[in-house]
Amino acid sequence: MDVVAPAMAAWPETLGKIIWYENDGATDPSWTVADEFAVHNPTTVQVADMDGDGDLDIVSGARGEDEGPNPITWYENDGAADPSWVAADIALTGNNSGLNDIVAKDMDHDGDIDIVAALYNSDTIAWYENDGNADPTWAAANISTSVDAAHTIVARDMDGDGVMDVSSLGAGNKRINWHENGGTRSSTAHWSIS
């Protein structure tokens, strides 16, 4: 198994990195840096097939430049044995929104991978719906705007109804929230907070 990880810079004005460590496949494996991407203050990374072409792409969340927008970016894998990557923004979450965490899951059960993000400074859990095209576009919607200092998110089917729900941690009030997806496997997702 390979590893993809964010590496924040020591100073805000310097770039951080998203680094892909490739496993050599040995019984006692070692990893080498296979690729890296310069990113301002990366906070989180996910690996998923974002465009449905059968290979794994990389998605990163970052705090961006000082007081600037916080990008969610996906790096499209070209599918080669030694892949090349093309970066495209999924969303710019707003100046100084405090993008803290992302999850890449099929939230609306339509067969493509969507993004959920925790935005610390705006107390928001946001959902970016993938339209499912080979060159996807993303529709933004808020799951909640009342998670005090939104910090960490997990997407799972919490109530066994066949659709993805979201759990979030509000670091400000140290509260764990459950955002129930009230949609069905054949209807649009909609959310309530418990």
What is the predicted role of each segment?
Residues 16-21, 70-75, 124-128, 174-179:
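A short loop-to-beta-strand structural motif that recurs across blades of beta-propeller domains
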Residues 21-40, 76-97, 129-148, 180-194:
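Blade-edge motifs of beta-propeller repeat domains
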Residues 43-50, 100-107, 142, 151-158:
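Beta-propeller blade termini
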Residues 1, 5, 54-56, 111-113, ...:
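Glycine-aliphatic tripeptides that mark coil-to-beta-strand junctions in extracellular
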Residues 15, 42, 69, 99, ...:
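Short coil/loop residues immediately preceding or within conserved phosphate-binding loops
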Residues 8-13, 63-68, 121-123, 171-174:
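Short glycine/acidic-enriched loop and turn motifs that connect beta-strands
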